[in-house]
C-alpha cells in the first residue's frame, strides 16, 4: 500500500502516520523528521531548510526532494506512507513521475482536516525534548509531570522556533495557498479520503 498523508500543520499527521504505518506494517517516511535530523546535524541542507522553516515558509522543492531522496532505500520501497511530502502540485507531479519509473502508483491520499484555531492551540502548546524529539508534550493536553522537564528522560522541554503562534499562522497561510491545491490534484485521480482531525 502506498499512501500520502496531507493536512494543515498541527492536524496530527505525525501521530496518525505512525499509527497507520505500524498497523499496515509499512515504512513511514516523514519529511519533517528528515528536516529536523538535517538541522540537528547542521548539514548544508539542514541549515538552508531551517532558514525557511523559522520564517514559516515552505522549504523549496529542490531542498525537500534532495532530503526525501535520502530516505528512500534502493530500490524504492514497494509500500510506504509519506508524511509531509508532497507539499505542492510540483512535488506531487515529481512523486508521480518517480513512482511511474518504478511501475507504481499511489493507492490513497488521506486529507486530515482540522479547524484553524484548534491547529494554532495544538502547535503553540507543543513542547519537545531536547534529548529526543520523539518525546513530545503539550502544555494543555499532555503536560509533563514537572514543567519544562521530559517525563521519559529528564531532558529539557522547549518550544520549537516554528511553533510560535505567529509562525503557525504564517505556516497555515502557506498551507492554504501552496499545499491545499494538491488535494484537488489527487481528487482528480480519485485518491482522496477526507478525515476530520478534531480533538486533542
UniProtKB/Swiss-Prot annotation:
Pathway: Purine metabolism; AMP biosynthesis via salvage pathway; AMP from ADP: step 1/1. The keyword Transferase applies. Its EC number is 2.7.4.3. One of its GO terms (biological process) is AMP salvage. It is found in: Cytoplasm. Gene3D superfamilies: P-loop containing nucleotide triphosphate hydrolases (3.40.50.300). Keywords: ATP-binding, Cytoplasm, Kinase, Nucleotide biosynthesis, Nucleotide-binding, Transferase. AMP binds at residues 31, 36, 57-59, 84-87, 91, 160, 171. Disulfide bonds: none annotated. The keyword Repeat does not apply. It catalyses: AMP + ATP = 2 ADP. One of its GO terms (cellular component) is cytoplasm. It holds the Pfam family ADK. Belongs to the adenylate kinase family. Catalyzes the reversible transfer of the terminal phosphate group between ATP and AMP. Plays an important role in cellular energy homeostasis and in adenine nucleotide metabolism. Monomer. Consists of three domains, a large central CORE domain and two small peripheral domains, NMPbind and LID, which undergo movements during catalysis. The LID domain closes over the site of phosphoryl transfer upon ATP binding. Assembling and dissambling the active center during each catalytic cycle provides an effective means to prevent ATP hydrolysis. This is Adenylate kinase. It comes from Streptomyces lividans. The lineage of its organism: Bacteria, Bacillati, Actinomycetota, Actinomycetes, Kitasatosporales. The gene is adk.
Amino acid at each position: 500500500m502506498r499512501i500520502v498523508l496531507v493536512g494543515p500543520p498541527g492536524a496530527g499527521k505525525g501521530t496518525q502516520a505512525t499509527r497507520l504505518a505500524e498497523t499496515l506494517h509499512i515504512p513511514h517516511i516523514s519529511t519533517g523528521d528528515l528536516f529536523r535530523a538535517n538541522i540537528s546535524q547542521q548539514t548544508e541542507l539542514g541549515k538552508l531548510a531551517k532558514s525557511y522553516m523559522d520564517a514559516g515558509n515552505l522549504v523549496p522543492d529542490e531542498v525537500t526532494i534532495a532530503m526525501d531522496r535520502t530516505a528512500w532505500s534502493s530500490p524504492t520501497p514497494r509500500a510506504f506512507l509519506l508524511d509531509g511530502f508532497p507539499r505542492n502540485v510540483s512535488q506531487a507531479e515529481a512523486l508521480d513521475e518517480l513512482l511511474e519509473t518504478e511501475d507504481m502508483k499511489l493507492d490513497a491520499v488521506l486529507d486530515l482536516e482540522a479547524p484553524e484555531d484548534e491547529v494554532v492551540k495544538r502547535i503553540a502548546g507543543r513542547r519537545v525534548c531536547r534529548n529526543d524529539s520523539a518525546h513530545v508534550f503539550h502544555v494543555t493536553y499532555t503536560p509533563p509531570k514537572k514543567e519544562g522537564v521530559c517525563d521519559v528522560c529528564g531532558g529539557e522541554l522547549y518550544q520549537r522556533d516554528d511553533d510560535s503562534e505567529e509562525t503557525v499562522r504564517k505556516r497555515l497561510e502557506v498551507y492554504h495557498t501552496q499545499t491545499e491545491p494538491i488535494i484537488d490534484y489527487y481528487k482528480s485521480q480519485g485518491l482522496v479520503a477526507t478525515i476530520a482531525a478534531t480533538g486533542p
